[in-house]
């Protein structure tokens, strides 16, 4: 069995001479000294491929794969039609990067264009980009789109996913943009607090609908208050919920963002996912990343091109609207195939099942002594107060290979149901809780 031959000292010397230096550390001169490794990493001796494969199998076997899941909080188990994997695994698509001459790859560009078209239909917006890294990144990029010299403050609802909030804060910190949190009350954004906090320096207000607690926001009222202060509304949405709810544009949002993982991406231990972004025509030139457009070639045939490239880093460098470079085209392809395979009726059916099954679980949990924490409408997630410690509830379910809801900081539990959960699974879980926690 062959061995991997790494770069040796002679190779390093030749490469350094080629670029005109003899000191490897010269290449790291811009890296702060305290971040540079002082000694080589202490690594074990190399192993043969067969030994490595055996070790990796043993390591992966330590993961617990749950056949039944009642947890969401940003990553959701939805059914993925077989055609999604079949198309995405084709060697013509299965690549990490768009070719350097993208117009040569009309198939890839067409798939991205169709993805953009369907995202616009789903959100009601005028234009979509070719995705960013994930939903949190999309929200942060949207915040960056809205700021200008006069307006450099972003208001973020406390009902937004906490991980999204952290990413937005990081982006805004680097850009010198101020982030102000808007309190949540009764599981939704506090409109009164929003009125008190918004001012002439506010660039945008970020909300999530349905929000982190599963509740539907009073979106129209939030939009009215925000636009009254001449600020922009960024609405983070669940793409499955968007199939049956009003679109962000119908609510009056200026930018729609969200986590695209439910659109054909497996949970996959957190990634790769995709962040979708769509906006009104007025915001189009501030959208980050690639945008594919449709045109005609010199023979009059339909053709696809990368358009509005003056926004991108390979044209404007440090003045670009974004520095997204690693391509999410494969994830966008999966999302496009998923939406095309499901169709309008299929996505509405999946969303409707999410709603009905989640409400069924809520009623069953109430019979088991759990109480819903927040009133109002919800999609497929909701929060309950538990008569037992949340950790104990999940420990009991774990023994039966069921992943329970997410324990929140106040001890309540955030539950999630999708079309993949059956009535039998719900009844079994509730029965286990009644029997073993009584």
Give names to the regions the model predicted:
Residues 36-113:
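N-terminal entrance/gating region of PLP-dependent enzymes' catalytic architecture
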Residues 15, 137-300, 368-369, 373, ...:
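Conserved PLP-enzyme active-site core in the AAT-like
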Residues 263-368, 372-375:
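Active-site C-terminal subdomain of aminotransferase-like
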Residues 100-104, 120-140:
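Short loop-beta-helix segment that forms the pyridoxal 5′-phosphate
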Residues 1-25, 29-35:
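Compact, charge-rich alpha-helical regulatory domains located at protein termini
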Residues 116-119, 138-146, 335-339:
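Buried hydrophobic packing segments
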Residues 91-102, 118-124, 150-151, 172-180, ...:
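Gly-rich Lys/Arg/Thr-decorated short loops/hinges at beta-loop-alpha junctions or inter-strand turns
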Residues 345-428:
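Conserved C-terminal alpha-helix-loop-beta "cap" of PLP-dependent enzymes
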